[in-house]
Amino acid sequence: MSCIKMKDKCRNFSLSKWQDTRKPWLILIIVTIGLTCIAHFLFQEYLFMKPCEQCVYIRFDMLVMAIGGMIALINPANNIIKIFSYSLAFYGIWLGLEHCLTLNHIHEVVHSENPFAGVDGCREIPIYPFNLPLYKWASSWFLPTGECGMDTPVVPENAYNHLNAFQKFFIGTPPDFENGLYSNGWYLIPSLKFMNMAICCLIAFLCCFVVLFAMFIAYVLDKNKPNAKIFALVIVALVLVLKFIGESKNPNQNIASLNQVVLRYS
């Protein structure tokens, strides 16, 4: 009987109907906030991996997507709500993909034999969309304290005698910290240096995009929603507006040269 019920559920499943429910948006919120909290509490606070400029941007991108999901929870079937929820979700994904690709490029350059191959540098003070001073509002979350492309643990001396076995397993033992799982930086498979943090985050954003884009297309093609195409155009337009108006450039921001970063660690 359970198999029959499962087949009936699969047969009656509609992506268009599903995107009108709170479930996909709740999953989006859990994933994005969960990853952001892991980055902050586990990697930054517990394992002493300081975030760089692109890292804090990726946190912002994740939270933008989460805000879109929270808005959708109000009434996911409402077209006006959809405009804001889809727009913020796609906007966050767009930013996230850009920042992940930038971070991966920096990571490859820093760890290559030619460390001066076309990377502009790393800002000490980040520039967020619409000049949001997030680094002032929540500095522990959004102010970069690490070097670009260098995600090795930086353990303060006053913590040497307070490390537990779990921390030592990942970051190593003092004073050199060379025998930890992440002593050479974070990788999905550290022994092979396979898939750095930027690539893993890139995959996460791509997975979110695939699911959301499928939901979006199902919404647009739903015959029971005659105005869906109009609202879809509004969503696309709003994403473009957010992306291009939100970009800001402040020449007075302090920029640390990548050359100095590389020389410091060479």
UniProtKB/Swiss-Prot annotation:
Name of the molecule in the record: Putative protein-disulfide oxidoreductase DsbI
Cystine bridges: C52-C55, C122-C148
Cell location: Cell inner membrane
Listed InterPro entries: DiS_bond_form_DsbB/BdbC, DsbB, DsbB-like_sf
Family affiliation: Belongs to the DsbB family. DsbI subfamily.
GO cellular component annotations of the record: plasma membrane
Transmembrane segments: 25-47, 62-81, 198-220, 230-247
Encoding gene per record: dsbI
Its job: Required for disulfide bond formation in some proteins. Part of a redox system composed of DsbI and DsbL that mediates formation of an essential disulfide bond in AssT.
Subunit text: Interacts with DsbL.
Membrane topology type: Multi-pass membrane protein
Keyword entries, A-Z: Cell inner membrane, Cell membrane, Disulfide bond, Electron transport, Membrane, Oxidoreductase, Redox-active center, Transmembrane, Transmembrane helix, Transport
Keyword Transmembrane helix: yes
An MF annotation (GO) of this entry: protein-disulfide reductase activity
GO BP annotations, alphabetical order: protein folding
